[in-house]
C-alpha cells in the first residue's frame, strides 16, 4: 500500500482510493453499479472483475454531519442487486415486501433541497430494475434518452 498524505489518496493494488469519497463500481457481467465508502470493498470487487469508475466517484460524509441525511444500502440475494435510498420507509418496504437484506448506512449526504453542494441525480432502468446515481448531467441526460427513467436530484454532496 502506498499513501500520499498530501493528496489524501491511497494506491492499493493499482487502484486509486481517495479519502472522503464514495466509490462507484460497475459489474460488466451483470450491469450492476454499486457504491461504497469502503476502499477494501473496492479492491475486493475489482479483483472479482468489477470496474472502478473513478470518474464517477463523489465526495460524501462517512459520518452524520449537521444537516446531512443517511443513505441506506440494501441487497437482494434473489437478484444479486443492491438498492440505495435516502427514504427509510422505502428501505423498510424493500426488506419486508421484497426480501432485501438491510446493509445499513453507506454514507451521509445533503438533502436535495440543501442550499449548497453538487447535484447527484437518480435514474431507474425499467428493463433490469436497477437504479443509478450520477453527478454527471451528460450521463443523466444520455441515459434518459435511451429509456432510463430520470428521477431528478436525489441528494447533494460537497
Where are the regions that the model predicts?
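Extracellular glycan-binding segments that recognize GlcNAc-based cell-wall polysaccharides
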Residues: 1-158
Amino acid at each position: 500500500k502506498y499513501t500520499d498524505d498530501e493528496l489524501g489518496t491511497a494506491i492499493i493494488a493499482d487502484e486509486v482510493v481517495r479519502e472522503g469519497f464514495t466509490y462507484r463500481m460497475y459489474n460488466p457481467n451483470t450491469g450492476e453499479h454499486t457504491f461504497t465508502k469502503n476502499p477494501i470493498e473496492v479492491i475486493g470487487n475489482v479483483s472479482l472483475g468489477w470496474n472502478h469508475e473513478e470518474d464517477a466517484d463523489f465526495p460524501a460524509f462517512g459520518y452524520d454531519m449537521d444537516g446531512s441525511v443517511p443513505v441506506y444500502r440494501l441487497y437482494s440475494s434473489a437478484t444479486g442487486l443492491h438498492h440505495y435510498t435516502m427514504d427509510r420507509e422505502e428501505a423498510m418496504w424493500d426488506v419486508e415486501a421484497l426480501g432485501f437484506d438491510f446493509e445499513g448506512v453507506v454514507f451521509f449526504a445533503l438533502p436535495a433541497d440543501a442550499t449548497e453542494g453538487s447535484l447527484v441525480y437518480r435514474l431507474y432502468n425499467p428493463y433490469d430494475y436497477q437504479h443509478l446515481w450520477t453527478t454527471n448531467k451528460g450521463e443523466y441526460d444520455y441515459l434518459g434518452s435511451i429509456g432510463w427513467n430520470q428521477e431528478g436530484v436525489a441528494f447533494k454532496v460537497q
